[in-house]
Amino acid sequence: MAVVGAGQAGLPIGYFLKQQGCHFLILERARQIAPAWRERWDSLTLFTSRRYSALPGAPFPGDPDGYPTRAEVIAYLERHAETFELPIEFDSEVRKVELNEDGRFRLELSGGRTVAAVQVVVATGPFQTPYAPKLAEKLSTGVFQTHAVGYRRPDDVPQGTVLLVGGGNTGFQIAKELSASHKVVLSIGSRQKSLPQRLLGRDLFWWLTKARILDKNVDSRFGRKLSTRDTLIGSSPGEMTKRFRVELKPRLVEAAERRVRFENGSESEVDAVIWATGYRSDYSWIKLPIFDEAGRLRHRRGVTEMPGLYFLGLTWQYTRGSALIGFIKGDAEFIAEKIAAHEKSKAREAERTPVDAGAYAGLHSEEGAN
């Protein structure tokens, strides 16, 4: 079987597949582990402590109550893959997935190679295609622009007024960092509930775990309600204005040259814009009938309607923790068990039905593959 992606979703499913004794290969488009983490800004610090940032099988090293940096996360993921000897093939971008006539999945890889697999896990995670609104095209070419994925450090941003568009955790964190060296305007489209990173001396996720809030899933009324709300962790609008002197603005509605206008009619002139406006899923490479009329994936806890095809690491795939590095293990173990059961079922079917040698295999290189 094949796993697409060697990041915070691909590694835990790999761990559990090894526990199940499954034969599999992890296909990674980049040349290194966890490319999505390498694309984040240098000073990024997780809002989950090390205690709640570990993958299955290995605790996150260091002070369990401290908060790991981007560099620490990357090093940890690399060690995890090495420790459990996960079979990863780098420089192997999956460009198409379709169904073969024999019922197996056919994966077209970069370089013209193909792989056939009885089962496939898409573990590309929630950070796929950076999104910026059409307004970006109306700004002058003299205005520095980048999506948050392209931001690394304050020195890369021209001096002057910087507009951060996006009121999520990313927008707030980057605004804080830039406020020490730039004039920062933060445009917030919709207000989010602010939660402290620590409460009564305990990490927020200690409380959420104790209250079993992170166990609430999309099948429950409370879980469905939570899934429609985003939360700010460790930041608040009041803190931004008072401590960091960031100017808060409502939704951005218009742009022309260097001028931008907000929903309340106020305007600003900007020298740089950072779009912290999130990501969009891109599954155009999956040529299978698993999407609804609006293009949304149809699944139940990552299990699609097509036998043998699974997804892992989606936002609210099942719970609030489904896309968080330290809480993805529940979904990963669930899917690994489904995969093992499916594999055993196929093996029993093959025993009952005479087939040509090699017709059933967990993973098979077709013509053009190594």
Residue ranges and their predicted role:
Residues F47-D65, D215-N217:
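Glycine-rich flavin
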Residues Q32, W41-L44:
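Aromatic-lined carbohydrate-binding/catalytic grooves of carbohydrate-active enzymes
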Residues M1-A30, A34-A36, D65-N370:
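Flavin (primarily FAD) cofactor-binding/catalytic cores of flavoenzymes
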Residues W37-W41, T48, R198:
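Short, flexible helix/strand-to-coil boundary loops that buttress conserved ligand/catalytic motifs
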